[in-house]
């Protein structure tokens, strides 16, 4: 009987702790505070910029809506063990420090990595849309 009660208590404790795992939320700057978003491929000198207010708002909103939390952690300034990535830099209007996230594909899945904050899986549509920016002149 004592073993049974111990097993039940342990099981309930495990379930409670498992349910308390928080989902990290990707926190991007507010679109009103951004003057420009720059997009640059890792090994390229080619930098594309987005400076239209509605495009900035739309991109930030889409990334936030379509990002799913993962258990992966970001422990470096830039993604590691990734062949190629896109640097997405948010230039703030009234602040010296800019925000940056990285978009990359790993094992046929697309991720956004925010240095030291976390890694989120994103919908392939977002990745494709950002990739298309490099195919057209803005």
Name what the model sees in each region.
Residues 40-74:
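Post-signal-peptide N-terminal segment of Sec-exported extracytoplasmic proteins
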Residues 69-109:
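Short, structured surface segments that line ligand/substrate-binding pockets
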């Amino acid at each position: 009987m004592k073993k049974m009660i111990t097993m039940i208590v342990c099981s309930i404790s495990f379930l409670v702790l498992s349910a308390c795992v928080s989902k990290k939320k990707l926190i991007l700057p507010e679109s009103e505070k951004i003057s420009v978003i720059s997009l640059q491929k890792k090994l390229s000198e080619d930098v594309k910029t987005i400076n239209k207010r509605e495009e900035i708002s739309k991109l930030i909103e889409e990334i936030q809506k379509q990002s799913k939390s993962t258990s992966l952690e970001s422990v470096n300034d830039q993604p590691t063990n990734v062949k190629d990535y896109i640097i997405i830099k948010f230039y703030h209007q009234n602040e010296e420090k800019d925000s940056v996230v990285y978009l990359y594909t790993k094992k046929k899945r697309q991720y956004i990595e925010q240095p030291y904050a976390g890694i989120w899986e994103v919908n392939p549509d977002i990745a494709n849309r950002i990739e298309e920016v490099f195919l057209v002149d803005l």
